[in-house]
């Protein structure tokens, strides 16, 4: 309350490992780290623990916990200062690229932890907090280009910024998941 009195535009972001719907209210937090998103993406693409149908169930259940405007403010990480890095968990570059695409197109705010964009790897804490790799020769340039491209597309797309979310396909046999985002005429 004191922070909002001092600066009504201040963003209050909380960290919680569970769903945050009880913490997100006008008199509480504006947003929270959405580890439910991270866990679903990691379980499907990095750990191969769940099917597309289970992914869909988890993502839609998560979205149902919040009013839509709140869901659009959730902070969606693939990893963080407290988790193994996605690159460390998923050594398959194609699956990693799919995870980035999911993160950049899913409702909410994509949270890119430093180094994610260049493929920084690291296991459990403290390895997830390793120094940034500044040597461009050691950076994953393809991954960086993908991040730049998807961020550019997201910035220009009303559907990706505030559009609705509908599942189009869950194929457990082929391990395919597709969804659609629309906002007016934009999709």
Residue locations for each model-derived region?
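Residues that form or immediately flank small-molecule/cofactor binding pockets and catalytic motifs
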Residues: 17, 117, 172
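A conditional alpha-helix N-cap/helix-loop micro-motif detector
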Residues: 55, 92-93, 172
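Short Gly/Pro-enriched turn/cap motifs at secondary-structure boundaries
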Residues: 103, 167-170
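Active-site-proximal substrate-binding groove within the catalytic cores of carbohydrate-active enzymes
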Residues: 61-163
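Active-site-proximal helices and loops of the catalytic beta/alpha 8
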Residues: 1-69, 102, 121-149, 180-184
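Short beta-strand-initiation
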Residues: 98, 165, 174-176
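Intrinsic-disorder/low-complexity regions
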Residues: 33, 78, 163, 170-174
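Carbohydrate-binding surface patches
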Residues: 169-187
